[in-house]
Amino acid sequence: MGWRNVAAAMVLGAALGAPAAAEASTSTTVSAEVDAAAVVRGSETGLPLPRYVSLRAGRANLRRGPATSHRVDWVLTRRGMPLEITAEHGLWRRVRDADGETGWLHHSLLRGDRTAMVTAETLDLRAAASEDAVVTARAERGVILPIQTCVTDWCRLGAGRTAGWAPKAAIWGAAAHETF
């Protein structure tokens, strides 16, 4: 529903003596349009951009452009490291790492598994998503852990007995608004 239809609904609602109904309809429609317009989709996959993935390979050349003919700027050597996809071009994905370095990787070097890198000096993993919860494990800066789920401000990381909740502010690999 475009802005003309929204305006027409407001005028029609007001003319029929139902200003509250017109206002409610308008705010719902405008909100839905803004939410849909805010999501940027990748030209190749149709998936949201930016989005997080992890490095499939134990060694990957981070290139200056989307082809093997482009210069290698960095060599990534940590299988499972979280990366943020910021653009797509054919079979190539522009990614950003936790340090802010960017470059292009072939899509086959990436996987959809979600991981997080600890950015805090020491991270307490907790039994629940609360600062008051019991500490179940600790991780140091740079440790990479699988993400099980995320809520508003917390993510459950790890596997088995070394799993626990961590505040999103202490990790890199999940956006502030993400829940899954």
Please identify what each model-predicted range represents.
Residues 1-3:
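N-terminal secretory signal peptides that target proteins for export/translocation
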Residues 7-17:
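Bacterial N-terminal signal peptides
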Residues 22-64, 75-79, 86-89, 96-101, ...:
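SH3-family beta-barrel domains
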Residues 67:
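Intrinsically disordered, low-complexity polar regions and short flexible loop motifs
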Residues 70-72:
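Beta-strand-rich domains and repeat architectures in extracellular enzymes and scaffolds
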